[in-house]
UniProtKB/Swiss-Prot annotation:
The record marks G251, C252 as: Cleavage. This is Protein hedgehog. The lineage of its organism: Eukaryota, Metazoa, Ecdysozoa, Arthropoda, Hexapoda. Interacts with shf. A lipid is attached at C79 (N-palmitoyl cysteine). Belongs to the hedgehog family. Ca(2+) 2 binds at E144, E180, D183, D185. Its main location: nucleus. One of its GO terms (cellular component) is endosome. A lipid is attached at G251 (Cholesterol glycine ester). It comes from Drosophila sechellia. Pfam families: HH_signal, Hint. InterPro entries: Hedgehog, Hedgehog_Hint, Hedgehog_sig/DD-Pept_Zn-bd_sf, Hedgehog_Signaling, Hedgehog_signalling_dom, Hint_dom_C, Hint_dom_N, Hint_dom_sf.
Length: 465
């Protein structure tokens, strides 16, 4: 059987490609006919314009296909961090221990749930921002009888609903129990996110305390910004404010962070240019030099919250919370990619060995946070980059290195096709041409398009929310 006959979009793509080729050929023929009497300079400029038009059409077609294709896959064929497309493999989840918090930071830091914004009362203007949660898979104790325990911020509701589903999967017949959410009676001291609807205390419906360590872990996986196994009687979870600027939208490094060029020179990311070959990493963890093909985000003035990862070898990586960082799993001898704000102390990251030049695991000994000026997100052809000697992905927000790399395929194709353009040298020789790095200020249009479409084609569990 012909493969195209069973895949409708493949036939459509073939027809579109043929149509595109015909248009380019027709355009080329007309251009050739009209240029018989034209000067050599005019013919050269027409050839350049014609080649760029065909290239633009082809790139648009490939980009459209790669955006549409994910919609045709069932979410059941999901992929975990760094495992590529295919069958989902369950990963081991370890329960939290009593008094453990994730992240291991103060609840009110920017890398956790963020600062307090003020008590919300029933007569407060912000009270209308609280939303009721009527999820039938969640039990609400509601001791006050006012329905206050059902009120919470939008983000808290989203995470709680995800957790409720996880609880039913983990323990069939057991439901999530919420013992406290928004509090209007000041039962939690002077400072508490309960007063803002950004915190919940939870347990399981059977009150089995042996489950609470795993319940806390499930809360972390559900996306709560700060989780504490605070007591043997319950778990405490909180989230960032709905009104806060989302620090996880972008995946970037600081401009002062450095990359190693193929020449052996270290260069600040803020000074990198398209075409620079920097130290990167292959899919199997080998060091390799790869070309910078674009900047997914570049803004030297923007203030941003960053996570800082300190290793026992002295390396320090400063990166935004939603950025993927390579993590070595010694038990399974596998390399995975994990969101920076979910890396914990004792996790192992890959760091360049000064003597051998190879990437070796080093243990994370400290996880901190910092607010700094400027963001830079270079994209290499390999999809990875070694920054401050620590191996990291070029991608963020989506918890799969392979899926994100696949999504940027049109940009790699465009870069390759541009290198084949016969007029490339002539165009670049013009004194008016400025490097893309100098021109760009903000998010690259293609990266921005992918970010917007992800909410429609990817399940929430695949995203950093």
């Amino acid at each position: 059987m012909d493969n195209h006959s069973s895949v409708p979009w493949a036939s459509a793509a073939s027809v579109t490609c043929l149509s595109l080729d015909a248009k380019c050929h027709s355009s080329s023929s007309k251009s050739a006919a009209s240029s018989i009497s034209a000067s050599p300079e005019t013919q050269t400029m027409r050839h350049i314009a014609h080649t760029q038009r065909c290239l633009s059409r082809l790139t648009s077609l490939v980009a459209l296909l790669l955006i549409v294709l994910p919609m045709m896959f069932s979410p059941a064929h999901s992929c975990g961090p760094g495992r590529g497309l295919g069958r989902h493999r369950a990963r081991n989840l370890y329960p939290l221990v009593l008094k453990q918090t994730i992240p291991n930071l103060s609840e009110y830091t920017n890398s956790a749930s963020g600062p307090l914004e003020g008590v919300i009362r029933r007569d407060s203007p912000k009270f209308k921002d609280l939303v009721p949660n009527y999820n039938r898979d969640i039990l609400f104790r509601d001791e006050e009888g006012t329905g206050a325990d059902r009120l919470m911020s939008k983000r808290c509701k989203e995470k709680l609903n995800v957790l409720a589903y996880s609880v039913m999967n983990e323990w069939p017949g057991i439901r999530l129990l919420v013992t406290e959410s928004w509090d209007e009676d000041y039962h939690h001291g002077q400072e508490s996110l309960h007063y803002e609807g950004r915190a919940v205390t939870i347990a399981t419906s059977d009150r089995d305390q042996s489950k609470y360590g795993m319940l806390a872990r499930l809360a972390v996986e559900a996306g709560f910004d700060w989780v504490s196994y605070v007591s043997r009687r319950h778990i405490y979870c909180s989230v960032k404010s709905d009104s806060s600027i989302s620090s996880h939208v972008h995946g970037c490094f600081t401009p002062e962070s450095t990359a190693l060029l193929e020449s052996g020179v270290r260069k600040p990311l803020g000074e990198l240019s398209i075409g620079d070959r920097v130290l990167s990493m292959t899919a199997n963890g080998q060091a390799v030099y790869s070309e910078v093909i674009l900047f997914m985000d570049r803004n030297l003035e923007q203030m941003q919250n960053f996570v800082q990862l300190h290793t026992d070898g002295g390396a320090v990586l400063t990166v935004t919370p939603a950025h993927l960082v390579s993590v070595w799993q010694p038990e399974s001898q596998k390399l995975t990619f994990v969101f920076a704000d979910r890396i914990e102390e004792k996790n192992q990251v890959l760091v360049r060995d000064v003597e051998t030049g190879e990437l070796r695991p080093q243990r994370v000994v400290k996880v901190g946070s910092v607010r700094s000026k400027g963001v830079v997100a270079p994209l290499t052809r390999e999809g990875t980059i070694v920054v401050n000697s620590v191996a990291a992905s070029c991608y963020a927000v989506i918890n799969s290195q392979s899926l994100a790399h696949w999504g940027l395929a049109p940009m790699r194709l465009l870069s390759t096709l541009e290198a084949w353009l016969p007029a490339k040298e002539q165009l670049h020789s013009s004194p008016k041409v400025v490097s893309s790095a100098q021109q760009q200020n903000g998010i690259h249009w293609y990266a921005n398009a992918l970010y917007k479409v992800k909410d429609y084609v990817l399940p929430q569990s695949w995203r950093h929310d």
